[in-house]
Protein backbone atom coordinates (compact mmCIF):
# COMPACT_ATOMS: atom_id res chain seq x y z
CA UNK A 1 0.00 0.00 0.00
CA UNK A 2 1.20 3.25 -1.27
CA UNK A 3 -1.23 6.15 -1.56
CA UNK A 4 -0.91 8.17 -4.76
CA UNK A 5 -2.24 11.72 -4.52
CA UNK A 6 -2.72 13.67 -7.76
CA UNK A 7 -3.41 17.37 -7.57
CA UNK A 8 -4.53 19.92 -10.11
CA UNK A 9 -1.39 22.07 -9.88
CA UNK A 10 1.06 20.35 -7.53
CA UNK A 11 2.05 17.20 -9.40
CA UNK A 12 1.82 13.85 -7.62
CA UNK A 13 2.64 12.97 -4.01
CA UNK A 14 3.36 9.42 -2.87
CA UNK A 15 2.67 8.44 0.73
CA UNK A 16 4.46 5.21 1.71
CA UNK A 17 2.74 4.60 5.00
CA UNK A 18 4.92 4.20 8.11
CA UNK A 19 8.11 3.70 6.11
CA UNK A 20 9.21 6.81 4.25
CA UNK A 21 8.35 10.49 3.93
CA UNK A 22 6.03 11.51 1.09
CA UNK A 23 7.73 11.59 -2.32
CA UNK A 24 6.65 14.24 -4.79
CA UNK A 25 6.74 13.75 -8.55
CA UNK A 26 6.54 17.09 -10.30
CA UNK A 27 7.10 18.71 -13.67
CA UNK A 28 10.58 20.15 -13.98
CA UNK A 29 10.88 22.68 -16.78
CA UNK A 30 13.18 21.38 -19.52
CA UNK A 31 13.47 17.92 -17.92
CA UNK A 32 11.80 15.22 -20.03
CA UNK A 33 12.34 12.76 -17.16
CA UNK A 34 9.59 14.34 -15.08
CA UNK A 35 5.82 14.79 -15.31
CA UNK A 36 4.75 16.59 -18.48
CA UNK A 37 2.49 18.84 -16.34
CA UNK A 38 1.68 19.37 -12.68
CA UNK A 39 -2.04 19.45 -13.51
CA UNK A 40 -2.71 15.76 -12.82
CA UNK A 41 -6.27 14.51 -13.43
CA UNK A 42 -5.93 10.72 -13.02
CA UNK A 43 -3.37 8.04 -12.13
CA UNK A 44 -3.35 4.41 -13.24
CA UNK A 45 -0.86 1.57 -12.70
CA UNK A 46 -0.60 -1.10 -15.39
CA UNK A 47 -0.17 -4.82 -14.66
CA UNK A 48 3.49 -4.42 -15.67
CA UNK A 49 3.93 -1.83 -12.90
CA UNK A 50 4.26 1.24 -15.10
CA UNK A 51 2.50 4.33 -13.82
CA UNK A 52 0.34 6.45 -16.11
CA UNK A 53 -0.53 10.07 -15.29
CA UNK A 54 -3.31 11.91 -17.15
CA UNK A 55 -2.47 15.62 -17.22
CA UNK A 56 -3.61 18.82 -18.89
CA UNK A 57 -0.71 18.44 -21.36
CA UNK A 58 -0.99 14.74 -22.21
CA UNK A 59 0.02 11.44 -20.65
CA UNK A 60 3.21 10.80 -18.70
CA UNK A 61 4.24 7.14 -18.39
CA UNK A 62 6.80 6.28 -15.71
CA UNK A 63 8.67 2.99 -16.00
CA UNK A 64 9.04 1.99 -12.37
CA UNK A 65 11.91 -0.43 -13.05
CA UNK A 66 14.17 1.98 -14.96
CA UNK A 67 12.81 5.27 -13.62
CA UNK A 68 12.48 6.61 -17.18
CA UNK A 69 9.57 8.67 -18.48
CA UNK A 70 7.68 8.72 -21.77
CA UNK A 71 5.17 11.39 -22.80
CA UNK A 72 2.34 10.74 -25.27
CA UNK A 73 -0.76 12.57 -26.52
CA UNK A 74 1.18 15.77 -25.88
CA UNK A 75 -0.85 18.99 -25.67
CA UNK A 76 -4.12 17.04 -25.26
CA UNK A 77 -6.02 17.51 -21.99
CA UNK A 78 -6.35 13.97 -20.64
CA UNK A 79 -8.89 13.42 -17.86
CA UNK A 80 -9.55 9.71 -17.26
CA UNK A 81 -7.49 6.50 -17.51
CA UNK A 82 -8.71 2.90 -17.54
CA UNK A 83 -6.48 -0.14 -17.95
CA UNK A 84 -8.15 -2.96 -19.86
CA UNK A 85 -7.65 -6.65 -19.13
CA UNK A 86 -4.86 -6.96 -21.71
CA UNK A 87 -2.86 -3.99 -20.38
CA UNK A 88 -3.98 -1.45 -22.97
CA UNK A 89 -5.15 1.90 -21.60
CA UNK A 90 -8.33 3.80 -22.48
CA UNK A 91 -7.91 7.58 -22.18
CA UNK A 92 -10.77 10.06 -21.85
CA UNK A 93 -9.93 13.59 -22.99
CA UNK A 94 -11.39 17.06 -22.69
CA UNK A 95 -12.37 17.82 -26.27
CA UNK A 96 -10.69 15.01 -28.23
CA UNK A 97 -12.82 11.94 -27.42
CA UNK A 98 -11.33 8.65 -26.26
CA UNK A 99 -8.04 7.00 -27.20
CA UNK A 100 -6.97 3.39 -26.76
CA UNK A 101 -3.21 3.12 -26.23
CA UNK A 102 -1.05 0.02 -26.04
CA UNK A 103 1.18 -0.44 -22.99
CA UNK A 104 3.95 1.51 -24.79
CA UNK A 105 1.70 4.52 -25.39
CA UNK A 106 1.02 3.94 -29.11
CA UNK A 107 -2.45 4.88 -30.36
CA UNK A 108 -4.48 1.79 -31.32
CA UNK A 109 -7.87 3.44 -31.66
CA UNK A 110 -9.45 6.91 -31.47
CA UNK A 111 -13.18 7.35 -30.81
CA UNK A 112 -14.86 10.71 -31.45
CA UNK A 113 -18.26 12.33 -31.71
CA UNK A 114 -17.56 13.20 -35.35
CA UNK A 115 -17.15 9.50 -36.20
CA UNK A 116 -20.50 8.76 -34.55
CA UNK A 117 -19.00 6.58 -31.81
CA UNK A 118 -19.49 9.08 -28.97
CA UNK A 119 -22.12 11.72 -28.16
CA UNK A 120 -19.53 14.15 -26.77
CA UNK A 121 -15.76 14.60 -27.06
CA UNK A 122 -15.54 15.91 -23.48
CA UNK A 123 -14.98 12.67 -21.55
CA UNK A 124 -14.74 12.72 -17.75
CA UNK A 125 -14.88 9.00 -17.03
CA UNK A 126 -13.91 5.76 -18.79
CA UNK A 127 -14.35 2.47 -16.92
CA UNK A 128 -14.42 -1.21 -17.76
CA UNK A 129 -16.91 -3.37 -15.87
CA UNK A 130 -16.44 -6.94 -14.67
CA UNK A 131 -17.77 -8.34 -17.96
CA UNK A 132 -15.22 -6.34 -19.96
CA UNK A 133 -17.79 -3.84 -21.27
CA UNK A 134 -16.49 -0.28 -21.63
CA UNK A 135 -18.49 2.61 -20.12
CA UNK A 136 -17.84 6.20 -21.26
CA UNK A 137 -19.40 9.41 -19.97
CA UNK A 138 -18.77 13.11 -20.07
CA UNK A 139 -20.17 16.59 -20.59
CA UNK A 140 -23.40 17.17 -22.50
CA UNK A 141 -23.61 13.69 -24.00
CA UNK A 142 -25.18 10.33 -23.22
CA UNK A 143 -23.62 7.56 -21.18
CA UNK A 144 -22.20 5.04 -23.68
CA UNK A 145 -21.50 1.33 -23.18
CA UNK A 146 -19.50 -0.73 -25.68
CA UNK A 147 -20.44 -4.38 -25.17
CA UNK A 148 -17.34 -6.56 -25.43
CA UNK A 149 -19.07 -9.82 -26.35
CA UNK A 150 -21.51 -8.43 -28.93
CA UNK A 151 -19.25 -5.70 -30.26
CA UNK A 152 -22.21 -3.33 -30.06
CA UNK A 153 -22.75 0.14 -28.65
CA UNK A 154 -25.59 1.20 -26.35
CA UNK A 155 -26.42 4.70 -25.16
CA UNK A 156 -28.31 5.70 -22.03
CA UNK A 157 -30.06 9.00 -21.37
CA UNK A 158 -27.68 9.97 -18.57
CA UNK A 159 -25.90 13.29 -19.12
CA UNK A 160 -23.09 15.28 -17.52
CA UNK A 161 -21.31 12.14 -16.27
CA UNK A 162 -18.51 12.91 -13.82
CA UNK A 163 -17.65 9.40 -12.63
CA UNK A 164 -18.43 5.75 -13.35
CA UNK A 165 -17.70 2.90 -10.96
CA UNK A 166 -18.54 -0.79 -11.47
CA UNK A 167 -20.34 -2.16 -8.38
CA UNK A 168 -20.79 -5.84 -9.27
CA UNK A 169 -21.50 -7.99 -12.35
CA UNK A 170 -24.89 -6.37 -12.94
CA UNK A 171 -24.54 -2.80 -11.68
CA UNK A 172 -22.55 0.31 -12.47
CA UNK A 173 -22.77 3.48 -10.35
CA UNK A 174 -22.78 6.73 -12.32
CA UNK A 175 -22.22 10.13 -10.72
CA UNK A 176 -23.39 13.16 -12.68
CA UNK A 177 -23.31 16.91 -12.22
CA UNK A 178 -26.93 16.73 -11.10
CA UNK A 179 -27.42 13.34 -9.41
CA UNK A 180 -26.02 9.90 -8.59
Segment roles from a protein language model:
Residues 1-180:
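Carboxylate-rich, polar loop motifs that coordinate divalent cations or form catalytic acidic clusters
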